[in-house]
Amino acid sequence: MSQSNAVSKQSEQLHKDVQEAFKSFQSVAPTALKTTDYSKVLTSTLAATQKSVKIQIAAGDLTLLKQSGYKLCFAKKVGNEAYNVVWQSYVQYLSNSTFSWTPQYQLFGANSFQANVQVDVSTNLVNIGLGQQSILDNAGLLGSATSGGPDTSITLVNNYGAIHPGLSQLSTGIDGKQISTPIYVASAQVVTGQTVLTPVETILVWFEQNVQTSTMFSTSRSQSIEIDLTFDNSATRLYSGGSWTVV
C-alpha cells in the first residue's frame, strides 16, 4: 500500500467512525446529517486531537548542522519501551520548523527487528484506532479493526505465531506533507495471544547524520530532548549553542 493511499484510507476510516458515533444518537436526533456535517465534525475532531511541536534553531547552530550533514529527527514513544524507530528525519529544516500528528494509526507485523536497518513491514497494514483490536490469523493476515482491548491502547490478537508487532502513525511533516510511517517495532518477538500497544504522547527530537526515516535503533540518541504533550497540544523548543531550552 502506498503512503498516499494509506493516508486516504485512514481519513476514510475516521470519517466512518464519526458517522457511527452519530448514528448512536439517532434515537435522540433522528434527522439525518449531511456529508458536509460529518466533514465539519471530522475536521474539528482532528483539530482537537492534533499535537504539534515547533523546533527553533539559532542561526549559528543551523549553519553548523547543515554544513555537517545533520538531519532533524523525531521518534514517538509506545508504552514503557525505549524509543526504537526514527519516525521522521528531515534535511530541509529551517530556523523554525513545525511537526504535528493526529491519533490515526496502522497496525502491522514484522519478521525481524534489527538496529540501523529500515523497518520491513511483513504483514498487511490495518487502519486502527485506540480502543480497537485486530486479529492476525494463522495465515498471517491482519483483519479489520474492531472494538476491543483497553480504551487507550491498540490490541493485537495473535493467532499466527512469532511476530514483531509494529505501529505506524500519521504525521504532518515540516514540509506540510501528511504521511504514515512506523513509530514502533517490538524488539522481541511475541507469541500467540494478546499484545497491547499503548502510544504515548511523548516524542524525542534530535539531530543525526546518515540516518533515514523508519530506521530502527537500540541505543540512546545523543543531544536529544524529550517533549511530553500528554496534557498539552503544542510545545516549542529552542536549540542554541548545542543545547535545548524550553521556549
Q: What do these predicted regions represent?
A:
Residues S2-V247:
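Intrinsically disordered, low-complexity segments enriched in small/polar residues
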